[in-house]
Amino acid sequence: MDLLNKTILITGASDGIGEVLAVEFSKLGSNIVLLGRDPSKLDKVYDRLDHSFGSQKHLILQADLSLLSNESAHEILIAITEEFNCLDGIIHNAAILGTMTTLEYYELSKWDEVLNINLRAPFLLTKTLKSILEDSSLPRIIFTSS
């Protein structure tokens, strides 16, 4: 698949697998939308992205997926539409394990955070971005886990 000028949204792009994916896809000529919680980490990843292709652009979007709402997902749609007017792929990479403890000590608030980041946010982002994603000739959605 030719990734030149394809626009790819990567969640959890501030480090780890998300950072590597962003850097490697940019080397293939993709426009990268970096989505993560930590603006300073996102800035560092942005600085590592390849900008050598003429029309290549990248975008940083800061969001805490544990708190993602319909409104904030819609703001992400607007930002991507204004910058690129297209979206060819989403890589749902953001995930957390939560507290490593026995059930009796596991706090409900931590469980809610795990569910929000790992399940609710990918669902809500995909649902919200579906309209712009469907305009792509070959849209892709990838879910990762580690």
Question: Could you tell me what each predicted segment is?
Answer:
Residues 6, 86-88, 133-146:
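Active-site loop of short-chain dehydrogenase/reductase
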Residues 30-45:
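Conserved glycine-rich Rossmann-like NAD(P)H-binding loop of the short-chain dehydrogenase/reductase
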Residues 76, 101-103, 110-115:
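Substrate-binding pocket helix/loop in short-chain dehydrogenase/reductase
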Residues 126-127:
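A short, exposed helix-loop element centered on a Lys and neighboring polar residues
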Residues 14-15:
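Conserved glycine-rich cofactor-binding loop
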Residues 93-99:
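Conserved NAD(P)H cofactor-binding loop of Rossmann-fold oxidoreductase domains
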Residues 53-69:
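Rossmann-fold cofactor-recognition segment
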